[in-house]
Amino acid sequence: MPPFFSPYGIDAISVSIPYWLDLLTVIIGAISGILVARDRHLDLVGFVGLGLLGGLGGGLIRDTMMQQGGVYMLNSPYAIPAAVFTAVLLFMFPEPLDRFPRMLEWTDIISVGLFAVVGTDKALVYHLLPFSVILMGSITGVGGGMLRDVFLGDIPRIFQRSNLYAFCAVAGTTSYWALVSYVGVTKIWAAVVCVAITVGLRRWSLKFNVLSPADIDLTPHVMRRVNKLRRKAQKPGKQPEHNISSK
């Protein structure tokens, strides 16, 4: 079992997470896209396309914005082949996907948590500012799903009223950043906490039907308060007396 606290403290920020975790994240993200392709009855091209978007889309957006360290999907010898192989394999043998009707729901949010880890970690390795770190982690977490929805002609889920979908990514990203940067927790355990928070918040919001707010208009409430204060200020009152004393 890996140690919980890093013996190097926050100096371990500059050490990237294990490569196998990157690859596992790509595969799970690809499966989430493939499940949507299966649900939409797409052909092999659709399976491969959504597998690539789900597995590599978030990282592509992150790397394009950061412009540091190269583009992971192009530099890695395994990322694209892993996503394509997973898509082709599940296209030919889709029965395991059909056995679990809620598999999409689980793989989708787990992939968000894992992508939040790798996105936050790369931003930490290149010493970005805290808000930039959280932004990169969150975008990496939801970016693949966003591109998938756009390519399917749907409104991305992060822009719709949902069960705290994007908020889960922000919360997981923030936890990873704080644990690694300030507490000195090893990156493996920080990743476990990040995924647990992301998945846990999502499951909690689904269980209790907690939805992100939408169609809010505070204008009438604010205007009523303003009008009330204005009427109160306009009421006639006793004018203060000004005593002018002559010297």
Protein language model annotation of sequence segments:
Residues 1-15, 64-74, 118-132, 178-189:
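Helix-coil boundary and interhelical linker segments in multi-pass alpha-helical membrane proteins
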Residues 14-26, 71-85, 129-142:
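Structural signature of hydrophobic alpha-helical transmembrane segments
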Residues 19-32, 50-53, 172:
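The first (N-terminal) embedded transmembrane alpha-helix
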Residues 30-40, 63, 88-101, 146-157, ...:
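C-terminal ends of transmembrane helices
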Residues 45-53, 76-81, 101-112, 136, ...:
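Cytoplasmic-side transmembrane-helix entry/capping segments in multi-pass membrane proteins
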Residues 49-53, 60-66, 135, 139, ...:
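Short, structured motif recognition centered on aromatic/hydrophobic residues
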Residues 51-57, 107-121, 139, 164-177, ...:
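Small-residue-rich segments of transmembrane alpha-helices in multi-pass membrane proteins
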Residues 213-243:
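Short, highly charged, low-complexity non-transmembrane loops/tails of multi-pass membrane proteins
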